[in-house]
């Protein structure tokens, strides 16, 4: 099993690479790519960790050597948020980066499962899909927007509020991956209930958690370590499913049947070919249903922006 991390010299990429070096199954290969010249050195640094995961680093304009034979590609390349920016402000820079890298994936490892971490995810996933489609290699079961950070934040905040162990809480989060499009299904957590006010406040905190980190870092960065952990969790789940483990379920942002929007985050059963089944989002509370209806315009607009970037 070979996993490639693109954008591996950045804050998320280095954290993700460290976690994968420690947690990938024995015998796996990990390849790191970034435009930054430090990348081969990051791989050398990580190579001193005594796990049976082979690691190599590549830098420069060409990601091809890192992508050859990859089963899973995780893309965290791009610029990070600064105070006062929201994820959509990143679009102008990151759209071109994702387009370029996905074009290289289409040529080099078109059958790989691709997880997009680069924000704005609502839009960059649509860009990736259109690039793969143009190249004639698009498989909607193999392209994911990694929204796992919304899930782990929800788990943490719910556990804090309700005095639970964070490891016993699993909150499904649907919709997209920015602002109002992030919708935690708090009504679906077994054995936990919320007042309407608690649900509204907690939903808002989860939606704005990224901004909380950006402001706390006072201009020194965005959520890199928690995002690295979230991306590692998703990547490792994908690897387990590709290797034949049954019953692996994660929420991610994928193309579905278009019931709500072309791309939508929902619980997925993962399998040997990527998405095995898009699971139902279940019954929503009145607050959740209202939030879902209210976000769809924003989500569809974000998606359209990505489609137009490639097709216009």
UniProtKB/Swiss-Prot annotation:
Any single Pfam family the record assigns to this protein: Ldh_1_C
Catalytic activity of the protein: (S)-malate + NAD(+) = oxaloacetate + NADH + H(+)
InterPro entries: L-lactate/malate_DH (IPR001557), Lactate/malate_DH_C (IPR022383), Lactate/malate_DH_N (IPR001236), Lactate_DH/Glyco_Ohase_4_C (IPR015955), Malate_DH_AS (IPR001252), Malate_DH_type1 (IPR010097), Malate_DH_type1_bac (IPR023958), NAD(P)-bd_dom_sf (IPR036291)
Binding site for substrate: 81, 87, 119, 153
Gene Ontology biological-process annotations: malate metabolic process; tricarboxylic acid cycle
Keywords annotated in UniProt: NAD, Oxidoreductase, Tricarboxylic acid cycle
UniProt-listed Enzyme Commission number(s): 1.1.1.37
Cellular component GO terms, alphabetical: cytoplasm
Name by which UniProt lists this protein: Malate dehydrogenase
């Amino acid at each position: 099993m070979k996993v490639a991390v693109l954008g591996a010299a950045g804050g998320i990429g280095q954290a993700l690479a460290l976690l994968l070096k420690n947690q990938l199954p024995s015998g796996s290969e990990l390849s790191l790519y970034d435009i930054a010249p430090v990348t081969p050195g990051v791989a050398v640094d990580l190579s001193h960790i005594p796990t049976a995961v082979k690691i190599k680093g590549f830098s420069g304009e060409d990601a091809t050597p890192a992508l050859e034979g990859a089963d899973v590609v995780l893309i965290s390349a791009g610029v990070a948020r600064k105070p006062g920016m929201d994820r959509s402000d990143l679009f102008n820079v990151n759209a071109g980066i994702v387009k370029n890298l996905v074009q290289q994936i289409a040529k080099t490892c078109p059958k790989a499962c691709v997880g997009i971490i680069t924000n704005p995810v609502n839009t960059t996933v649509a860009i990736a899909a259109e690039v793969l489609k143009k190249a004639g290699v698009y498989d909607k079961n193999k392209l994911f927007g990694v929204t796992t950070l919304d899930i782990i934040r929800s788990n943490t905040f719910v556990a804090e509020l309700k005095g639970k162990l964070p490891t016993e809480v699993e909150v499904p989060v649907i919709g997209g991956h920015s602002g109002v499009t992030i919708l935690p299904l708090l009504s679906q957590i077994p054995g936990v209930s919320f007042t309407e006010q608690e649900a509204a406040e907690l939903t808002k905190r989860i939606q704005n958690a990224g901004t909380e980190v950006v402001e706390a870092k006072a201009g020194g960065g965005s959520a890199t370590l928690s995002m690295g952990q979230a991306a590692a969790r998703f990547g490792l789940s994908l690897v387990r499913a590709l290797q034949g483990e049954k019953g692996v379920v994660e929420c991610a942002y994928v193309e579905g049947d278009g019931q709500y929007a072309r791309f939508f985050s929902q619980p997925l059963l993962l399998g040997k070919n990527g998405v095995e089944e898009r699971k139902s989002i279940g019954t929503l509370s009145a607050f959740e249903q209202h939030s879902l209806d209210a976000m769809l315009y924003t989500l569809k607009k974000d998606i359209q922006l990505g489609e137009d970037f490639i097709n216009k």
